[in-house]
Structure formats: structure tokens, C-alpha cells
Curated annotation (Swiss-Prot):
The lineage of its organism: Bacteria, Bacillati, Bacillota, Bacilli, Bacillales. It comes from the Bacteria. Belongs to the UPF0342 family. This is UPF0342 protein LMHCC_0319. InterPro entries: Com_YlbF (IPR010368), YheA/YmcA-like_dom_sf (IPR023378). Pfam families: Com_YlbF.
Amino acid sequence: MAVNIYDLAHDLDKGIRETPEFISLQDAYREVNENADAKAKFERFRDVQVTIQEKQMTGQEIDDETVDVAQKVAQEVQENELIVKLMEKEQAMSTIINDLNRIIMTPLQDLYNVAND
């Protein structure tokens, strides 16, 4: 019987959304967005992250000013308990996603390992 891999992917999507980790992440994200100070700091933090990633991807040097801003914003974020909680929940979801990715990649790893034996 042929498996529709996309149906499995949609089932996985649904399953992820039903995990306690995802639900906790949603709750933490909502709490950050409901607090004006936390929301502003979190948005600024994400903007700085995107700026740094864009520079890295385009091979641009990350100047001292960008580093200073990133450090300052990171410090502000670490002082906000709502954002810290959100980041902890993100880390838990990241662990799950990494585990799933490892499982998904197993067939390719097995294929190449067999081919190299």
C-alpha cells in the first residue's frame, strides 16, 4: 500500500499542535504579546536576531555596534520573566523538532550508510 507522505506530514503538524510543549509555547507567546513592555522587547530582540542572521548569510561583517546592540537587547530580554519563560518553551519545542528531524532523516542516513558498506 502506497503511503501519502504529505498526509503523514499533515498528521504530524496536527500532532505537534496538540503536544503539551506546543500548547505551553502558545500560552507563553500570548502572555508576552499581552504585555506591552515584554512584547516590545521581544520584537526588538527578534529584529536584532534577523539583522545578524542576514549579515551572516550575506557574508557581511558583524560590526561592533551591532554586537553592542545585540548584547544590550539580550540582557533586557533575560531580565523579563515572560520572555525568559517563552524562550524556555521555545527550547522545549526545538528539542522535539530536532528529534523529529533526526527520525525523518533516518531513511537517508540508512541508505547512505548501506551504500558505503
